[in-house]
Each structure stands twice: as structure tokens, then as C-alpha cells.
Design a protein with these regions (language model features):
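Extracellular and organelle-lumenal recognition/adhesion modules and their flexible linkers in secreted
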Residues: 1
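Active-site core segments that coordinate phosphate-bearing ligands/cofactors
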Residues: 4-191, 195-292
Length: 292
């Protein structure tokens, strides 16, 4: 109390909640606090989080901590170290003719690339990317791995490569989700938050079809800030429990993307190729990827 008064000029009646990690706060912000709800906080990188009443040993994820988000529940976390950063890299590598066309259409280059990529049918996609341009966090836990592009020909348009970057992040998420489901932590719904899902309908559509899960996009770009506000509301006795605060204060749904059966099936061969390359260069011969 003396510290609050002397340093911050606050009265002793002011209540301050404990701190929380930003991605963990985002779980509260989207209201994904029930078992089977998988939160993907998609920004420059992605954090994948789940809550469960049980602690189950799951290899190749970051770990699990009791009470980290909701009292009494275990918070499980995994992640990908380059997602939005990967798309920014792709934008910066775009050839001049695409940049010029984007300018002619008065569109940001990234938006124009996504528009072009959205017209590529899954069956036409012949490029597969290993999205390790910043190493691999989950499920290989190897920061020395580097990215690779497979399937290039002289006819490959650049927007196909950009689409492959997006698909690779979805494939990586599917591998992470498989780790949970193989260890009896089922997933029925994906909550997509962070700075990217509201901006990229193509990404959300690709994720829904690759993961074969419903993807819920929340109408808030500040889920982590909202989660922090929930902590404040709880400690200030506006709500009796943090769970009550989360259910009462969560933002409305912007839209829900359901998987489309034909597209789910069409992605299976590409995902299989990704997994084969993932294991070849990530597990069997990782030294081939140690180029830096």
C-alpha cells in the first residue's frame, strides 16, 4: 500500500491484479475457456493455447501450467515463431510487376497478393513450403532449422508461393493440434484472434479446411487487452470469478468459417507432402537445413 501511494499516487483502495502473458490474456479475451476450444493468437508469430482440467504429458509442445489462465485449469501452449512475419517477408519479396499492379489498383501489396492467391484452386497448387524461416518452435523445438520451398517450376506464379506460405502455417498448426488430439485433448472449435484473422479471410478459410474444424473469428483486434480488463474487473469485484468475467465481457463473433468437405479432401495430399518433408528435413536429416 505504501508503494502504491508513494510511487504511483494510488489510494490503498485501488486493486491491482497479477500479471498475465499477452497470449494467455487473449484466451480470456475471446472467451475460449472451455475444454475442446483451441485458441490461435495469430500475429507476427502464433501461440496455440488450450485449457483442460487434466494435466496430460504431451511431447513437443511448450508445456502446461495449472492456474496460468483460469484458476483450477491447466493451460497448454505451443507455437510457431514466424507467421505474420513470414507474410511480411513474402510481401517484401514480391516481384516488381505485382507491386506495380497493386499500386495501379490502389491496394496494399499484401492485400493484392492475397487477392491473386485466392483465385488459385487447391488442386492447382504445386508448391509446398516448410515455414521455418525463423526456426521451428513446435513440434520440433529446433531454432536452427531454415525454411524451404518445394515444387517450383518456370511457370510458378509468385502468388502461388505466397499462398503456399499461408498453407504452411496452417499445416504446422494441424501438426500441433494433432499432438493434442493424439494425447486425448480433443479439439472441436478453433478461435482465431490476434492481428491477422480479421484482415485475412483467405487465411481463415485455409485454416478451416486444412484443420477440418470450425474457425471462429472474434470481432476484436485487442483480445489480449480485453483479457487484461477482465482480470481488472475480477479483482475489482465486478464479477465473482474470472470465468464469469470472461463469459460476460467477451466480444461478439465477427463470423464463423466452417470447413468445406471438398476442400478438406483436396488439402489432404498437400498436407501429406508437408508432413513427409517436415519429417525428412526436421527429424531424419536436419543438418541439411542448417545453412546458416
Amino acid at each position: 500500500d505504501v508503494y502504491k501511494r508513494q510511487i504511483w499516487g494510488l489510494s490503498q483502495d485501488v486493486q491491482v491484479s497479477p500479471f498475465i502473458i499477452d497470449a494467455h490474456s487473449g484466451v480470456l479475451g475471446v472467451g475460449a475457456i472451455e475444454a475442446g476450444e483451441f485458441t490461435a493468437v495469430i500475429g507476427t508469430s502464433t501461440c496455440h493455447l488450450m485449457l483442460d482440467s487434466r494435466q496430460v504429458p504431451i511431447s513437443s509442445i511448450t508445456g502446461s501450467v495449472k492456474n496460468a489462465i483460469i484458476p483450477g485449469l491447466y493451460a497448454y501452449e505451443a507455437g510457431q515463431p514466424a507467421v505474420g512475419d513470414l507474410f511480411e517477408y513474402s510481401k517484401n519479396q514480391a516481384p516488381k510487376h505485382i507491386v506495380d499492379q497493386a499500386n495501379e489498383h490502389h491496394m496494399p501489396v499484401l492485400n493484392y497478393l492475397e487477392e491473386l492467391a485466392s483465385h488459385i484452386k487447391i488442386e492447382e497448387q504445386h508448391v509446398v513450403v516448410l515455414d521455418w524461416l525463423n526456426g521451428n518452435r513446435s513440434i520440433l523445438s529446433n531454432s536452427h532449422l531454415t525454411g524451404s520451398i518445394f515444387g517450383l517450376t518456370l511457370q510458378t506464379p509468385y502468388e502461388m508461393i505466397h499462398r503456399a506460405y499461408i498453407e504452411a502455417t496452417a499445416f504446422g498448426t494441424k501438426l500441433i493440434m494433432k499432438q493434442f488430439e493424439d494425447n486425448h485433448i480433443p479439439v472441436h472449435t478453433v478461435y482465431a484472434s490476434g492481428g491477422i484473422p480479421q484482415k485475412s479471410k483467405l487465411l481463415v478459410e485455409i485454416y478451416a479446411n486444412v484443420l477440418n474444424k470450425r474457425v471462429v473469428v472474434i470481432d476484436s483486434s485487442n483480445a489480449s487487452a480485453l483479457g487484461a480488463a477482465m482480470l481488472g474487473a475480477n479483482v475489482g469485484n465486478a464479477y465473482s470469478t474470472l470465468k464469469e468475467a470472461a463469459l460476460s465481457m467477451k466480444q461478439p463473433i465477427a463470423y464463423i468459417q466452417e470447413p468445406e468437405i471438398q476442400k478438406v479432401q483436396a488439402y489432404k495430399p498437400l498436407y501429406h507432402k508437408y508432413c513427409e518433408l517436415h519429417d525428412l528435413l526436421g527429424r531424419q536429416y536436419p543438418e541439411l537445413s542448417y545453412l546458416i
